[in-house]
Design a protein with these regions (language model features):
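N-terminal cap/leader regions of alpha/beta-hydrolase-fold enzymes
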Residues: 1-242
């Protein structure tokens, strides 16, 4: 797999996203814009991006936390504070997210990697909530997939959603971080907005079932089999979307 670090600036701050793709495969592929979990851009999230990309996609991974954040050691309290700070700041999510997507797309097009007509988005955990904010604000992705999403509901509940594409949420029925009422509210929002949506609810699954090393039952537990099944569902969803 190949990786390229892509720098960009937003509001006077420096960020570094990443392109991830299989360089043994020729030709243009769909571009999948990825909002990683609260660890940010690091070896952990690069590994997830590589799994997602496979031979099928080029992953454009956004950095929403700033240069060096991902590789720095952090306590859980620091992770939570940073992630919540980003998640609550809707203007930052939309502004920095748009700049990240533009910079990553420009770099991918420079290398002839992507088909600009086939654009999707994904997000893991807190990144899933961030991705949903982008698409409900009108970001033009043909399909969006969120895995064990955190805070799926809008910061600005009074705003009229402007979804452009399909949505798939892959979730754990026993996820205490994002319990059923939150997912029910997301379902109602998507239905009300006329979105072509799907929600796959895995029985007994907790939060972070795609995060290797997660082991804090009953809150979050990695499940390799469910994660692989999730990626198959994602691929099937995008195959029918593009």
């Amino acid at each position: 797999m190949a990786e390229i670090t892509v720098p960009y600036e937003y509001d006077g701050r420096q960020f570094e996203g990443m392109l991830v793709w299989d360089d043994s495969v020729a030709g243009q592929r769909p571009a999948i814009f990825m909002q990683p979990d609260w660890f940010g851009v690091c070896r952990h999230s690069a590994g997830m991006a590589s799994e997602v990309a496979g031979r099928d996609y080029v992953v454009l991974m956004a950095d929403m936390y700033g240069v060096g954040y991902g590789e720095r050691e952090k306590t859980e309290a620091e992770l939570l504070a940073s992630a919540q700070g980003v998640r609550r700041d809707l203007p930052f999510i939309l502004g920095c997210g748009a700049v990240a997507h533009a910079a990553l797309t420009e770099e991918a097009e420079k290398h002839g990697l992507i088909d600009p007509e086939r654009r999707g988005a994904i997000g893991f955990c807190m990144g899933g909530g961030i991705a949903l904010e982008q698409v409900r604000a009108g970001a033009d992705f043909k399909g969006t997939v969120v895995f064990h999403v955190t805070l799926p509901n809008p910061v600005d509940a009074a705003a009229t959603p402007d979804f452009k594409g399909r949505v798939l949420a892959i979730h754990g029925a026993a996820d205490p971080v994002t319990p059923k009422p939150m997912m029910d509210a997301l379902e109602a929002e998507l239905t009300g907005a006329g979105v072509d949506w799907q929600i796959m609810n895995f029985g007994h699954a907790t939060h972070s079932f795609c995060v290797e090393g997660a082991n804090n039952p009953p809150v979050q537990v990695y499940d390799e089999a469910l994660c692989r099944q999730s990626y198959r569902l994602m691929r099937d969803f995008f195959t029918h979307t593009f």
